[in-house]
């Protein structure tokens, strides 16, 4: 695993880092960007900015690892046929501005991927009951992940479902084990890279300023 610190556009990933060049090109990219909605939710500890540094939409679109014109094409670290799993915000006061639905698709395209479908994480409480989340119009109980492709990747199996259920982690924005085992690691045998990671995972290259 590589611990390569990168939280802002001014501190990009070291693209020549041996851990990256050794495992590239990556066939799966997972990303849970720090979307800039941190100050929109009232109350202590509710916004993303309370838990980690957020980025502007332009910084996310132009992310150096895979993003647009910023990346030197000679150092492309993503395979010609690859998958992108891009998490977006699924709760907020105004669905047009706080869920970043359209922006997530824009980011995927800016990174060179074509959006195809979505994965839905239906949350449960620690007791296995339905999660009662945030939202002003209705209370959300799910998170959404855009699945996009680059080139023509082929899934390893054909029976992967788009909806998963899992108990909510106490750690902000942490994704459940079932997301990796039942979807990501079934659709491709890697190599895998996770951007904006907050923990490590065996067999993955995990990049982020919170990676231990």
What is each model feature region?
Residues 1-212:
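Class I S-adenosyl-L-methionine-dependent methyltransferase catalytic core
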């Amino acid at each position: 695993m590589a611990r390569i610190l990168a939280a802002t556009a001014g501190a990009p990933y070291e693209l020549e880092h041996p851990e990256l060049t050794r495992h590239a090109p990556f066939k799966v990219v997972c990303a849970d960007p720090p979307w800039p909605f941190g100050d929109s939710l009232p109350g202590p500890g509710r916004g993303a900015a309370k838990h980690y540094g957020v980025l502007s939409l332009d910084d996310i679109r132009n992310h150096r690892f895979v993003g647009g014109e910023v990346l030197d094409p000679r150092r492309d670290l993503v395979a010609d046929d690859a998958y992108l799993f891009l998490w977006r915000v699924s709760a907020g006061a105004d669905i047009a501005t706080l869920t970043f639905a359209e922006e997530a698709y824009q980011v995927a395209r800016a990174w060179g991927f074509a959006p195809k479908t979505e994965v839905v994480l239906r949350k449960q409480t620690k007791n296995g009951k339905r999660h009662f989340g945030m939202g002003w119009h209705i209370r959300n109980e799910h998170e959404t992940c855009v699945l996009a492709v680059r080139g023509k990747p082929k899934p390893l199996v054909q029976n992967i479902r788009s909806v998963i259920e899992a108990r909510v982690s106490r750690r902000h924005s942490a994704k459940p084990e079932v997301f990796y085992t039942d979807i990501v690691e079934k659709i491709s045998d890697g190599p895998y890279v996770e951007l904006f990671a907050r923990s490590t995972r065996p067999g993955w290259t995990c990049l982020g300023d919170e990676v231990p």
